[in-house]
């Protein structure tokens, strides 16, 4: 099978709050904004924010789907998660630094950064 995964969406209760959170986190403006579904396009991948309650859907928040964002360095990772509620602290796992935070809407999001050879990063 030849396939490609091109998008994922997170359920949000408050679109304005969620858009502000992710604009700050990604350091870029939302690509498409709507009261029900807003989109960030990052490296060709579409991350959607879905205001599920506006269309009468139900949803359970938590860690059943874990988007993972890769950044270039542990310094960037630390800067991006500073002040956020961590549900998994910064930890070295094999060749990566990994942390997981809870976003403004209750979703869990992982952030990873590569460990540099001889970098003494801790």
Predicted regions and their residues:
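Loop/turn position at the start of each blade in beta-propeller repeats
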Residues: 3, 35, 94-96
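Vicinal oxygen chelate
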Residues: 4-13, 41, 58-122
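Core segments of cupin and vicinal oxygen chelate
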Residues: 9-47
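Generic preference for hydrophobic
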Residues: 47-49, 111
């Amino acid at each position: 099978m030849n396939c490609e995964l091109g998008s994922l969406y997170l359920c949000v209760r408050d679109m304005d709050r969620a858009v502000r959170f992710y604009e700050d986190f990604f350091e870029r403006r939302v690509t498409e904004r709507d009261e029900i579904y807003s989109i960030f396009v990052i490296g060709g991948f579409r991350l959607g924010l879905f205001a599920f309650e506006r269309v009468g859907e139900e949803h359970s928040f938590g860690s059943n789907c874990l988007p993972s964002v890769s950044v270039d360095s542990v310094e960037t990772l630390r800067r991006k998660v500073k002040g956020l509620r961590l549900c998994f602290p910064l930890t070295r796992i094999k060749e990566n630094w990994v942390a997981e935070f809870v976003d403004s809407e209750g979703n869990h999001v992982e952030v990873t950064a590569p460990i540099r050879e001889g970098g003494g990063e801790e």
